[in-house]
Amino acid sequence: MTDLNSESFSALNFWKSVEKKNISTNFQGTKVVAPSKKINSFPLLAPPAPPPPPTEQEINIGSGNSTFISSNNNNSNNNNNNNSNNNNNNNLNNSNNNNNNLNSNNNNNNNNNNNNNNGNNNNNSNFLTRQDSSTQKEWDEQNVTEAFGFWKQKAVQLQKETERYNARRNARQTIDLTNILRKSTSSDLLIKPPVESPPLTPVGQDDEGEQQQQQQQQKQSSPSTPSNDTDTETTAAAVTTTTTTTTTTTTSTTTTTTETVLQANQLEIKYGGETIAVVDDSGTTPRDYRRSRSISCEIIPKINGVITTSPQRVTTTTTTTTPSTGGVVVADEESDSSEEESDSSEEESDEYTDEESETELQVVSNATPRRSDDFTPTIVESPPLTSVNSNDNTSSGTVVAPIDLNSSTGGNTGSQQPPQPSSQQQKPDQASENTAVAASSISATTNVTSAASTTTVAPDSIINTKDVTVVSSTLTTTTSATSSTTSATTQSIPAPPSPSQQRAAQSISTSSVTPAAITKPTKDAKDKKDPAKKSIGATLTRTVTKTFIRDSKENNKVPTGTSPPVSSSTSISSSTGIKKDKVKLSKEEKDRIKKEKSAKKKKEKDEKKQQKTNKKALTKNNSSTDVKKGFVSPQQQQILDSPYRIYGVRLTQLVLSNDGDLPAILTQTITVLSNSNKLDVNSVFVGAENEPAVREIRKRSDLERIDFSIIGDPRVVAGLLILFFAELPQPLFNSKFFGDLVEINDITNPQVKLNDLKQLINSLSQLRRSLLQILVTFFTSKYINGNSVTTRAIAIQSIAQSFGPQFFRGTSSSDSDIQVGIETLKLIIDNYVFLFEKTNEPDVKYKNIDGKMIISEGSIDKLIDKATDQYYPYNEKYFSLTFFITHLFFIQPHELADKLITLYRENLDTLETKKKWKKHRRSKKASFINEAVKLWVDYCYKEMREDKELSKKILKGFPHLEAQLASRLSHRTTINDFLKLPKRVHSRTRSASFSDTLLSTGGIGSTSGGIGGGVNNCLLSAMEIAEQCTLVDYDLFTNVRLSDWVRLVQGSVDPQTAPSLSLALKRSTIWAQWAMGEILSTEDKSQRVAIINLLVDVAINCKDLANFNTAISIHTALTNHHIKRLQQTWDSVPKETLNKITQLEQSLQVWLKPDATNPFGVICQSINSACVPNFSILRTILSQIDQKIPTFSNDGSMVNVEKLRTIFGIVVEIQRLQQQRNYTMKPTKLFIQLQDINTVSMDELADLSLKCEPPVSKAKKYNAPADIVDEDWRLKITKTFNKPLATTSVGIDLPRLASSFTFNTTGHKTTPEEKSAYGNKIQDIFHVLVSLAQIESSELETDVREKFTTYIPMSTDPDSDFKRELLKFLDEVCHADNSKLVRVLKCCNQAIIAPVIIEITLNIAKGVPFMDAGGWRILISNINNSNNSVILDKIDEINEDSSNVEKEKLSSSQEQQEQQEQKQQEQQQQQQEPQPLFIRHYKKQRSRSAQSKDFFEFEWFIQLNLDADCKNILSFDLKISNLVFSTDTSPNIRDQLLESFKSYLVSQECVQYINFNENKQPVAAPVTPATTIVTTKEESTTVTSSTTTVVQESVPSTNAE
C-alpha cells in the first residue's frame, strides 16, 4: 500500500487516495430496508420424504449426558405438556370469557401441576434449558422449509381410508396416526412430544399435616440443599416474560370424578371398559386419539388406577406491560407484520436486536383455600430463573430481561440487582411486604386491554392470611377498569398424596427466592449448542411420530366440564361441589350474549387497529432504545423529533437521510483531523470523549445542526467521533458477528486467523465494510506510517484502545469483550493490505447485491469451498442448498463426494489431546463440511440410496457420521412408505375402452345426464373420471424428486436415474392417445359424438381441478388430424360442446401459448392450489430456460452461479406446487384401471380414423397443369444474397471454404506469421475475417483481431461444431447484415453457386453427364479480372510490328510526361471514389466415366460485381476458363461440348488436349481448323492456322492476374 507522508498528510490527499482505491463513499444505489425484529426463516424449500425414525444410538450420538437426559425426560415432558396446552388454548379462552366463573375451580389443580413440574426440574433446569434451546435452535436452523407440514397433510389425506381399521385398532389398544398429525402453531409441539402430567395434589389436608409432610419430603429428596422452616411460608412474585396481552389458558389433567356432559363433537374410545376422552382439535373437547398401527406406540398409561380424563380449562391472571410511549401495547399480531419484509435487510435489522427486547411481565396470583367455603386469598410466587422453561414462549421469540421490581413506573428496566443466593431467605413478613410492593408496581402498569383473573397455586404452601389479603387487594384495586377479575374455588375429592405431589411441594419450598434474584440470561448460555446435533432428516422423522394438537377452528366451542354462563347462584353451588342442572337460556338471553360477544370482538379489533397505528407512529421517528423506555419526557420527545439528531441513530438511517452519502460527522471530522498537524495519538484520542467541550457539543447536536469543520481543537473532534461510534444502536461491526470474533481471537495459527477474519469482514454490508476500510486507511496513513512523534506500536495501541471497543461491541461490557475489540482492531491495522487490498481471487467473481458481496462466477473448487464456508452464509443464506441441489449441471455426484472427502481431510485436526489442539487450533472448516454433507444427504438421499457405490463412498469418507447418515442411505422402510396408499392387486392387462364397456350398454354419464340411453344406468360421470385422472397424475407429480427436476431443466431424463419423471413425461402422450383411441375405437357415429361430449366434460372438470396435464392432453387429442378429419362426426357434435371446446382453449392459453419473456413465472402465478402441470409443456419451457442461460463462462473455466440460482428458484416453485393442499377425493376401481392404461400407436390410430370415415373421392374436372416458368439463375442468386445472415449457410460453408479464399484488394496485408499458420481451419477462418475487415475499416479489423478468440478459441477442435459461436461473433462483433464483411460472406457459400450448376446441367450442357472434380476457389478483388481478353491481349502484343516500337521510341518526352500525369490523376480519383468489389467462384467439373474415350474436364467461374457498399449485385458473368479433352475423346462428346460452351468460352485458346499414355505426358494432337494453336518463345512467335506441333496449356487466371 502506498502511504502518504504523515507530515504532509491532508484531507484532499486522503480522499483522493480513497477514490483511487475504489472505496465506496456513496450508497444511494444500495437497498437499505428499515430494520425489523428478527423473524424466523420463511419456508423456502422442503426436503424430500423423511427417513425412518432414528435408532437409540443415533439419538444419543455425540452426547456425553445422554443418560442424564433420559433420566430427566419425564420432568421435561411434563413442563412441555403444560406449555403446549397453554399455547393451544389462547383463542378458546378469549371466546369463552363468560365461562370463567365455572372454570376457575380448576386453577388450583393446574397451578399445582405446574409447581410440581417446576420443583421436579429444579436441580437440572439449567441443563434442560440449554438442551431445549439447543434443540429449538437446531430446528430453526435446519428446518428452513417446515417440510413436516407436507407429511402431516399426507397422513390427513388417508384419514377416511383407515376408518374400516378403527375397530381393529381399538381392540389392539393403539392410536391412529391420522388423528395425531394435525396442524399446530406451537413450535414446542414440534420439538418434544407431550406426555401425561402427574396428578395434582388433593385439597382438604390439614395445614399442620401439610407442613410436616413438606418438611419430611424436603429432607428425603434433597438432603444436600439447605433450607429453613420459613421456606414453606415464603412467597414471592412470579415474574415471567410474554409477548401477548390476551388472557392465557392452561390445560392440565385431573383425577376428579365430576360428571360432565360431553358436547356433540366429542369422541370416545374404549380402553378396558373405561372411557378415554382426549383433547380434540380445539384443545378442549375429547377426540379420537388413536395411532396408526404402522408405527409402534405404547398404550396410554393409567394414572393412579384412573384413566386420564378430559383436560380442564384454567384461566390465569396475565398482566402485561409493554415498553412504549403513551402506554401503547404492541401485540403479537402487529409485531409479526415485520416478517413480510425482505430477508436482505437481516443484517441491518440486527441493530435493534438488543434494544427491542420488550419487557413484559406476567403476574400469576395463586392461592389455595383451606376449605371450599373460605375466602380465596392471592399469593404471588417467585420461582428462580433456573426453573423457568426456556421454551415457554419459543414461538413468540421472547427474552427474559432484568426487571427492577422496586421501580414505581414499572417500565424502566435499566437497573439491575445482583442475584441473591437461595440460602439467604427473607422472613415471612419481609417477603410479604416485598410481594405487595411488587404486585402493586406491576398492577400499576397494567394495560387497558389486559384481563386479570385470580388463580391458585400449590395447596401445600403455608399462607400468611394478613399479608396475602394485602397483596390480593392491591392487585384487585390497581387493575384497570376494562379488566375482568374472577375467583373461584377448586372442586376435587381428597386423595392421598402421591410422590409427584411430594416432589412438587419440596420444589416450591426450596425454589422460593426474592424478586431481586431474577437476572437476564446471557447470550452465551442461550446460544450454546447441544453436542447431540441432529440433522433435519432425523428431526423430521421424529416430528412425524409425535403428537400434534390441532388449533381451535371454532372460537365458540365449550371446553370439557364447562357449561354456558349461569347466574351467581349456580356458580356458588358448583363451587361447593353440589351438582346443579343446567339452566336453559331463553332466545332473548342467547341473542343478548351473542350481541355482547360481537360488540366485544369489534371493540378488540378496533383497539388492535389503533395499537398498530400508534406503533407505526412511534417507530417512524424513534429508535428501539426510546421505545423501550416506556416513558418519554417532553424534553426527550423534543430530541426524538429533532431533524438534526445524529447521535444514537442508525448508520443506515443517517446515510439515507444524506442521499446515500456518508453523514457529515464522519466526513467533516476526518477532514479536520487530516488537516491537523497534531500527530501525538495519545493527546488526540485517548480519553477525548470525556472532555466537557465534547459533552456540550454532543448535547447541542440533538437540537441544532453542528458544523464540525469549524471546530479547531482536534481532540474535541476526535472525542465527538469516538462518541458517535459509541452511541450507535448497532456497532460498526455487527454485534451478531461478535461471537465469531471471539472464536477468531482464540485461534493461534496466524494464517488461519487472518483468512477467517477476511471472510468475516467480507460478510459485512457494503456500507460497513467501506466505512471500516476508510477509517483504517485514515488511521494508518495519518498516525501510524511515518509518524515522527509516536512510534508505530504505541500509535496502534492507542487507536485500538480508543476505537476498538466502539467498533466491536458484544452483548455485555465485560473486560474480556473490550479486550477482544482492541485486539481485533490491532490485527486489522497490522494486516490492512491483506484484509482489504488483496481481494482479487482468480477463480471467483463477485457482484454487489443490496450491499452484500454475492458470487456471480466461480470455479468448481471455489464453489465447494464457499458451500462449506463458515461465514459466506451471512451474505447468501441458501447458497449451500442451491449448490447441492443444482450440482448436476457441472459435476457428477461421485466427483463431488471425492472433493468433499479431500477437503475434509485437509481441514481435519488430527491432534488428539486438548492441550495440543488448543495450541495449534485451526478453523472450524471440518465441522461445516460435516454439516454440508448432512444437508446434501437430507435433500438427495433418495438418489443416493439407488446408487450404492456413492452411499458407501460417503459413509467411508465420513465414518464419524455413519450413525446419522446410515438410516438415510440404507434401504430400510421409511415413513413415506407407510403414508403411501397401498396398491391393490389386480389382474387387468389392458385398459377398457369406453366403447367396449360402456357405450354398448348405454352406461356413459355426464354432469348433465346420461347419453345414448344411459340416463338411468349412469355408471361413470365426467366428474368421477376427472377426479380419478387427477389422482393418477397427482401421484406421479408428487413422487418426482428434486434432482429429477434439475435433470429436466438440463434436458437429460434417463428412465433409470429418474423413473418417476420419465413416467410423468409419458403420461401426457398416454392421455392424448387414450382419448383418440376411445373416439376411434367405435364405428358408430352417435357413439363417437357421445364420447366426444364426455371427453370435453372430463377436460373441463380436470381444468377446474387444476389438472392441466389431462385437460391439455384431451384438448390435444381433439385437435389432432386423425380426429379433426372426421367431418361427419363433427357435424353431429352439438353446438354447446363446440362452445365448451372454445372456452376450454381460452382458459388454457397460459399453457398453450406461454409468455415469451417469463413463461414459467406466469404459470406459477396463475396457480394457487394443488395442481398437476402439463409435463410436456413444462419440459419445453424449462429446456428453453436452460438454453438461454449458459452454464459456464465464456472461457469455460468458471460456473455461472446466476444460472444455479435461477434453477434453484424453479425447483422451489415446482416443489411449492407439489406441497399444495392434497386432493380429498377417494380412489376407486377406476383409479387402478387408469394407472395401467394401454394406448394405441399413432399408425393404428391413423388406420382407425380411415376406417371410421373412409376418404370420399370426388370426381373433379381435369385441369392441365400450367406451364411452370423456370426462374432465371441470376434472380435466384439475388434472392439468396438478400436473405438474413441467420437463414444462410455461411456458418456451415465458411469453415470448409476458408482455405480457398484469395484476396487481391488494395490495402490487403498478410504477415509471414499468418501465412505460416495456413492449413489450420480456425486460423484460416480468422485470416479470412481479418482480410474482409480490412476492406471495410481499420476499427473493424482491430475488433476482429481482439475479440475472435473470446468466441472461438484457437485451441478449438477443428472438427467440432462451432456454427453458433461463429454466427454469434458475426452478429455481435461484425454487426451482422449491416456490415460489408457479412454481405461479402453471403456471396461466398454453396447457395450462390447452386443455381449456376443447375443452369449448366439442365440448359447449357444438356445431355452430357458430368460430375464435380473438386477444387473450389474464391477470388475477392476490387479490380475487374475478366479473362475475356487475357490471351488475346498477349497475342496482340506478340504480333506487334517493330515499327510500333520505334514510334514509341521516337515519341517526345513531353507526351510521356502528360500520359503519366493523366494516369496518376485517374488512380487518385479511383482511390478517392468507392471502388466496386468483384467476387469470383472457380469450380471444376469432369466426365463421369474414367475411360479416355469419354474423358473431358472443364473449369467455369461465376463473377459477381458488387457496388461500393456491397448492398446490391450490379452484374453477373458466367464463363468457361478451361476445357480439356483427351486425344481419344469421342467426336460426339467433344463437338457437343464445344457447341454448348461456344458462347461461354473465355477464348478459343483455352481448349486443350491431353494424351493419356503410360507417362501421361501431353503430346501433339490434331485439331479442327477453327482452333488456334499458340506457341510462345523468346525469340519469335509463329501463328499457324492449319497445323499445330505443340499444345500449350492455358495460363491460369490467377497467374495472369
Curated annotation (Swiss-Prot):
Domain Rho-GAP: 649-836
Modified residues (Phosphoserine): S197
Keyword vocabulary terms for this entry: Actin-binding, Cell projection, Chemotaxis, Cytoplasm, Cytoskeleton, Guanine-nucleotide releasing factor, Phosphoprotein
CDD domains from the UniProt entry: REM, RhoGAP
Function: GpaB-activated, rapA-specific guanine nucleotide exchange factor, involved in the regulation of the balance between Ras and Rap signaling at the leading edge of chemotaxing cells. Spatially localized activation of Rap and Ras induces F-actin polymerization at the leading edge of chemotaxing cells through the Rac, PI3K, and TORC2 pathways. Also acts as a key regulator of actin-driven membrane protrusions during processes such as phagocytosis and cytokinesis, possibly by modulating rapA signaling pathways.
Domain observations: The N-terminus (residues 1262 to 1601) functions to regulate both GflB-GEF activity and its localization at the leading edge of cells by binding F-actin directly.
Record protein name field: Ras guanine nucleotide exchange factor glfB
PANTHER family: RHO GTPASE-ACTIVATING PROTEIN 68F
Residue span, Ras-GEF domain: 1021-1255
Mutant phenotype after disruption: Leads to considerable chemotaxis defects, including poorer directionality, more directional changes, and slower speed. Exhibits impaired crown formation and particularly retraction, resulting in more crowns (macropinocytic cups) per cell and longer crown lifetimes. Leads to defects in macropinocytosis, phagocytosis and cytokinesis. Leads to increased level of F-actin as well as to flatter and more polarized cells during vegetative growth.
Chain positions of site Arginine finger: V686
Compositionally biased spans, kind Polar residues: 57-69, 384-398
Assembly information from the UniProt record: Interacts with gpaB and rapA. Interacts directly with F-actin.
Subcellular location: Cytoplasm, Cell cortex; Cytoplasm, Cytoskeleton; Cell projection, Filopodium; Cell projection, Lamellipodium
InterPro entries per the UniProt record, alphabetical: GlfB-like_C (IPR056651), Ras-like_Gua-exchang_fac_N (IPR000651), Ras_GEF_dom_sf (IPR023578), RASGEF_cat_dom (IPR001895), RASGEF_cat_dom_sf (IPR036964), Rho_GTPase_activation_prot (IPR008936), RhoGAP_dom (IPR000198)
PROSITE patterns: RASGEF_CAT, RASGEF_NTER, RHOGAP
GO cellular component: cell cortex; cell leading edge; cell leading edge cell cortex; cytoplasm; filopodium; lamellipodium; macropinocytic cup cytoskeleton
Renumbered residue ranges of the record's region N-terminal F-actin-binding domain: 1262-1601
